[in-house]
């Protein structure tokens, strides 16, 4: 399993890790985070994911380190703006796009960033996000995704983009 996201509270990472541990597969996870939160803040966010929480507690002891390896897999963290990040091509099977809203953080939702994320995904890879904003969905299509609205948790709907064909540009 391979994922990429904005790390922030580590929720997406922990959910992906719990899933990988339950299925007995290794996780290779790359997260981009412009402003990492302090260890003390991260330690307060507890989730009902017993396997992942055990690993996460160990990771917090070395926080903020940029690379963690374990029997469960690997977590790499890039502490910079996603616009500056160099991402591996055709590497990821999934991307969690989880910055603040398009209004609050328009750069992270821009076409250049979406193109970068599309190029990092393998064909058929998925990009998932809580935003269902029309302008964002149009930019996602332009970046080479088939765009779908899906039922959301706590929201009316979310967006899933499926990487199709060869990435544009």
Regions found by a protein language model. Give the residues of each.
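S-adenosyl-L-methionine
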Residues: 1-4, 41-89, 107-112, 130
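A short glycine-rich, Lys/Arg-flanked "PGG" loop and its adjoining helix->strand segment in the class I
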Residues: 107-124
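Conserved beta-strand signature within the Rossmann-like core of class I S-adenosyl-L-methionine
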Residues: 96, 123-131
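SAM cofactor-binding core of SAM-dependent methyltransferases
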Residues: 1-61
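A short SAM/SAH-binding and catalytic strip from SAM-dependent methyltransferases
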Residues: 93-108
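Class I S-adenosyl-L-methionine
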Residues: 132-169
């Amino acid at each position: 399993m391979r994922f990429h996201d904005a790390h922030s509270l580590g929720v997406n990472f922990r959910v992906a890790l719990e899933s990988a541990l339950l299925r007995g597969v290794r996780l290779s996870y790359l997260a981009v985070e412009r402003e990492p939160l302090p260890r003390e803040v991260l330690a307060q966010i507890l989730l009902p994911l017993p396997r992942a929480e055990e690993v996460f507690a160990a990771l917090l002891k070395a926080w903020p380190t940029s690379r963690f390896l374990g029997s469960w897999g690997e977590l790499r963290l890039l502490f910079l703006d996603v616009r500056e990040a160099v991402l591996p091509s055709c590497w990821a099977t999934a991307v969690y796009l989880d910055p603040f809203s398009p209004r609050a953080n328009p750069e992270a939702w821009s076409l250049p960033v979406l193109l970068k994320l599309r190029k990092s995904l393998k064909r058929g890879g998925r990009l998932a996000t809580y935003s269902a904003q029309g302008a964002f969905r149009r930019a996602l299509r332009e970046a080479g995704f088939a765009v779908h609205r899906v039922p959301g948790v706590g929201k009316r709907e979310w967006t899933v983009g499926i990487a199709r064909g060869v990435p544009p540009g």
